[in-house]
């Protein structure tokens, strides 16, 4: 489910659930957390995360999304990628939706194909992302694009993501992983203590990614709402949801 490959000081981690477009469940999160912990313990210089079968990650597996343990594991993974002492890179093709976009913005560097798709479609289901994601996304793309993605459930192609700064580099279809590993090799040759210090400074410049009382209230209201149940039911029944704001 989670494949790892060492290439010198670069570690490639691949989410391998192509039948689910690499949607995350508990096992996938456990595997990713284990791969990250092993990279930290092994002295890896750059960690590259990608997905198998033409997709990065299509989000959370909706059979586990309501589980508090899943949410806690996902946050641990995102924060671990953000705060790892070495640079982390997302190599994105196909769908990077919901938790897929969260994984991407947790990484320091992002490379994608022009046809990749980024988005946070929580509003289509009655879900709500945490304050960590809202803050990190806004820092990556700016308030205007973040509001379009979060309030209007708009998606960004890889090409558009490159234009707005969500993606740093583009790679041709079929050459993504090779391009990502080539870039990672370049990054791995730089001074690791300089990189570690720069990450600390950049992360501190983002400010507190924790919960404010107002956001926690709004978040918990969304997650305990009838609209959430309606959104999940509509998804399972493959029909449009009928949200009532309650």
What are these regions (language model features)?
Residues 1-52, 79:
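Conserved CoA-thioester-binding segment of acyl-CoA-metabolizing enzymes
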Residues 13, 17, 31-32, 49, ...:
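Terminal peptide-recognition signature
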Residues 28-32, 70-73, 103, 176, ...:
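Hydrophobic alpha-helical membrane-association signature
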Residues 51-81, 96, 126:
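Glycine- (often His-adjacent) and acidic-residue-rich active-site loop
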Residues 80-195, 225, 230-233, 239:
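Crotonase-fold acyl-CoA enzyme core
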Residues 149-150, 161, 201-205, 217-223:
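Helix-loop "lid/cap" segments that line or gate small-molecule binding pockets
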Residues 240-246:
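Short C-terminal tail/terminal secondary-structure segment
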């Amino acid at each position: 489910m989670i494949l790892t490959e060492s290439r010198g000081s670069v570690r490639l981690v691949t989410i391998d659930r192509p039948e689910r477009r690499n949607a995350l469940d508990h096992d996938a999160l456990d595997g990713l957390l284990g791969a990250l912990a092993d990279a930290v313990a092994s002295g890896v210089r750059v960690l590259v995360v990608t997905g198998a079968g033409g997709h990065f990650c299509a989000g959370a597996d909706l059979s586990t999304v309501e589980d508090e343990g899943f949410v806690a594991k996902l946050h641990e993974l995102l924060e671990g990628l953000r705060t790892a002492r070495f640079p982390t890179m997302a190599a994105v093709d196909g769908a990077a939706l919901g938790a897929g976009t969260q994984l991407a913005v947790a990484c320091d560097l992002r490379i994608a194909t022009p046809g990749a798709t980024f988005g946070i479609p929580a509003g289509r289901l009655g879900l709500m992302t945490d304050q960590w994601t809202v803050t990190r996304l806004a820092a990556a793309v700016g308030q205007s694009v973040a509001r379009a993605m979060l309030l209007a459930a708009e998606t960004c192609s890889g090409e558009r993501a490159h234009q707005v700064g969500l993606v740093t580099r583009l790679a041709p279809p079929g050459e993504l992983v090779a391009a990502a590993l080539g870039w990672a090799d370049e990054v791995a040759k730089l001074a690791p203590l300089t990189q570690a210090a720069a990450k600390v400074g950049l992360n501190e410049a983002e400010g507190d990614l924790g919960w404010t009382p107002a956001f926690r209230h709004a978040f918990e209201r969304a997650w305990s709402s009838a609209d959430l149940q309606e959104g999940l039911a509509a998804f399972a029944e493959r029909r449009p949801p009928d949200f009532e704001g309650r």
